């Protein structure tokens, strides 16, 4: 299965997402990985094998022409582009961190507004700097 999947150019995450879209059962990348490594229970392997065989047949038969499987893979979870923080903004975050390394949600919101950053970016910055 693994070799055929890779030859077709699909990731484990693509397969899990496609199974959900095509057959109604979404499987995580971890589950597909464990299937390939034969690390699932016998019962779960038996449940997953027919779905994966069906998916492989459809993927094999559609090579060369864009299909629903290709479209599903294309709309897979997109990662957010890495955030780059300007030097002046980083300085402001660092000075606030020295005063208060664990700001409240309200403080994070206020700081994000004042620095014109997304609240999530500020929250993650503080989490990363605690480590």
Swiss-Prot record:
Molecular function in Gene Ontology: DNA-binding transcription factor activity; protein homodimerization activity; sequence-specific DNA binding
GO cellular component: nucleus
POU-specific domain segment(s): 1-60
Pfam entry (one): Homeodomain
Annotated GO biological process: metanephric ascending thin limb development; metanephric DCT cell differentiation; metanephric loop of Henle development; metanephric macula densa development; metanephric thick ascending limb development; negative regulation of apoptotic process; negative regulation of DNA-templated transcription; nervous system development
Keywords noted in UniProt: Developmental protein, DNA-binding, Homeobox, Neurogenesis, Nucleus, Transcription, Transcription regulation
SMART domains named in the record: HOX (SM00389), POU (SM00352)
Subcellular localization(s) per the UniProt record: Nucleus
UniProt note on tissues of expression: Brain.
DNA-binding region: 78-131
Function (record text): Transcription factor that acts synergistically with SOX11 and SOX4. Plays a role in neuronal development. Is implicated in an enhancer activity at the embryonic met-mesencephalic junction; the enhancer element contains the octamer motif (5'-ATTTGCAT-3').
Subunit details: Homodimer.
Name of the molecule in the record: POU domain, class 3, transcription factor 3
Species this protein is from: Sus scrofa (Pig)
Gene from which this protein is expressed: POU3F3
